[in-house]
């Protein structure tokens, strides 16, 4: 992070990258490979501060320059996975929240404005927060051809003691409120449960997959986003 090269430039320099094999036939190997993305290391607090990786708002984080703090090992990762949507041309850039915007200006100056679509991931339990609005207004310009909000965790609203219609109405209200706040059509706000979609697919539980709402998101990606 002390260097001036952009991510785009570093992609042309194979020597700068570490390769981790992704064995899709082994759940254990897949888990280990994915866990490696979350690796951390300890460096001096001064270095972390200079790289913008020191959380000054956290009272538990030491401020002494000579103390050691934990920071992520990896700055950027590219994952090649043989999913049908990916093999058909879909590329997904996952930004790790608000901090990435300041630490990687390339994301906001080049990648996001030139994206075919931006999926803005929100929690249906919290809706659009103040910080969400700041990111949306500052970094997701109307010039992006497809601006889509995804309200995740709808399973938090599932309740066996409530009628299905009542739950559906509550989800619809949150969807409409998100549409209004972000100033995008209601059809561009999708309510899903990624966790239940995964469980349903693992178990072959079609009713759970249907309730998760994931099919609508997958159809949008396959039919509208892929060039």
Where do the protein language model's features map onto the residues?
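Globular "head" domains of long coiled-coil molecular machines
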Residues: 1-226
